[in-house]
Curated annotation (Swiss-Prot):
A Pfam family hit: 7tm_1
Positions bearing carbohydrate: 29
GO cellular component: plasma membrane
Predominant location category: membrane
Protein name: Melanocyte-stimulating hormone receptor
Keywords, in A-Z order: Cell membrane, G-protein coupled receptor, Glycoprotein, Lipoprotein, Membrane, Palmitate, Receptor, Transducer, Transmembrane, Transmembrane helix
Role of this protein: Receptor for MSH (alpha, beta and gamma) and ACTH. The activity of this receptor is mediated by G proteins which activate adenylate cyclase. Mediates melanogenesis, the production of eumelanin (black/brown) and phaeomelanin (red/yellow), via regulation of cAMP signaling in melanocytes.
Subunit structure: Interacts with MGRN1, but does not undergo MGRN1-mediated ubiquitination; this interaction competes with GNAS-binding and thus inhibits agonist-induced cAMP production. Interacts with OPN3; the interaction results in a decrease in MC1R-mediated cAMP signaling and ultimately a decrease in melanin production in melanocytes.
Organism per entry: Callimico goeldii (Goeldi's marmoset)
Covalent lipid sites (S-palmitoyl cysteine): 315
Ranges per topology, Extracellular: 1-37, 94-118, 184-191, 267-279
Cytoplasmic-side segments: 64-72, 141-163, 212-240, 301-344
Gene Ontology BP annotations: adenylate cyclase-activating G protein-coupled receptor signaling pathway
Membrane topology note: Multi-pass membrane protein
């Protein structure tokens, strides 16, 4: 097809720099050693993206519907869901367009494909940056709620949270526009890698400090009630396991993508690096998996949000199901307002 080159560009600017891309073929020709390339079927990729879309839409709907969830913490969780939704949605859109172009079902000019390529790349990059930023914002919010509990509501006011959210979105869009425009500069890719490492360090420091404070608090309760020390040790182990899972999932899902960017800068012509470049779609799939896991970690653990989500799902069958205000709901044909969990 005459547009094959333009179609391939939809795979994303961050896949590799032009230098790296041009040398991948040479590396493969000079060495007969096979590369480990993990194929990701388009159907699987689109299915994971769809699961992420549905999951995060439900989180946004539940938070928007229940006024009890209109706090700074849930605002950050809602924005994390929106950014994760955009991450999965933009990658699904890109994959769908490529499949349509390759199948000949979508015929358009190369200039239009190029505009789509630029738009989707900016959307993907900005949503990724937002997702990382809101993960950091949630960590900061929880840190303040623990170490400044008495002043929390005066520090983390809703207007301040809204200003922080607006600043994150604006900064992410502007930064991603610059990153995509100058993606072939090594400094741009290094900035992205440094930003990821900064978020990782920030989250690790804050959550480790929170775990230490929780262990101290548990130890104080044990001494007060004169209980046996093993109970405190068990609490510390559970907390350490939870922290390891939280940070481990974050690193495993995001780390390979930023490792890819690092290798693009430092070893674009190395044979081993060229093999890693071939698994770029695997790294994107891991990020999609992270957008599926985020609601399970940050949203669905809230009993209030789960209750509201249950109401949203049950009341979706009747347009007039919801009563005005809060998360209260009214069954159709009844004047009884349910303020507790809905019956199964």
């Amino acid at each position: 097809m005459p547009m094959q080159g333009a179609q391939r560009k939809l795979l994303g600017s961050l896949n590799s720099t032009p230098t790296a891309t041009s040398n991948l073929g040479l590396a493969a020709n000079h060495t007969g050693a096979p590369c480990l390339e993990v194929p990701i079927p388009d159907g699987l990729f689109l299915s994971l993206g769809l699961v992420s879309l549905v999951e995060n839409v439900l989180v946004v709907a539940a938070i928007a519907k229940n006024r009890n969830l209109h706090s700074s913490m849930y605002c950050f969780i809602c924005c994390l869901a929106v950014s994760d939704l955009l991450v999965s949605g933009s990658n699904m859109l890109e994959t769908a367009i490529i499949l349509l172009l390759e199948a000949g079902a979508l015929v358009t000019r190369a200039s239009v494909v190029q505009q789509l390529h630029n738009t989707i790349d900016v959307l993907t990059c900005s949503s990724m940056l937002c997702s990382l930023c809101f993960l950091g914002a949630i960590a900061v919010d929880r840190y303040i709620s623990i170490f400044y509990a008495l002043r929390y509501h005066s520090i983390m006011t809703l207007p301040r949270a809204q200003r922080a959210i607006a600043a994150i979105w604006v900064a992410s869009v502007l930064s991603s526009t610059l990153f995509i425009t100058y993606y072939d500069h090594a400094a741009v890719l290094l900035c992205l890698v440094v930003f990821f490492l900064a978020m990782l360090v920030l989250m690790a420091v804050l959550y480790v400090h929170m775990l230490a404070r929780a262990c101290q608090h548990a130890q104080g309760i044990i001494r007060l009630h004169k209980r046996q020390p093993p109970a405190h040790k068990g609490f510390g182990l559970r907390g350490a396991a939870t922290l390891t899972i939280l940070l481990g999932i974050f690193f495993l899902c995001w780390g390979p993508f930023f490792l890819h960017l690092t290798l693009v800068v430092f070893c674009p012509q190395h044979m081993t690096c060229s093999c890693i470049f071939k698994n770029f779609k695997v790294f994107l799939t891991l990020i999609i998996c992270n957008t599926i896991i985020d609601p399970l970690i940050y949203a669905f653990r809230s009993q209030e949000l789960r209750r509201t989500l249950k109401e949203v799902l049950l009341c979706s069958r009747w347009p007039g199901c919801w009563a005005e205000g809060g998360g209260d709901s009214v069954w159709p044909g009844s004047c009884v307002t349910l303020r507790g969990p809905l019956p199964p």
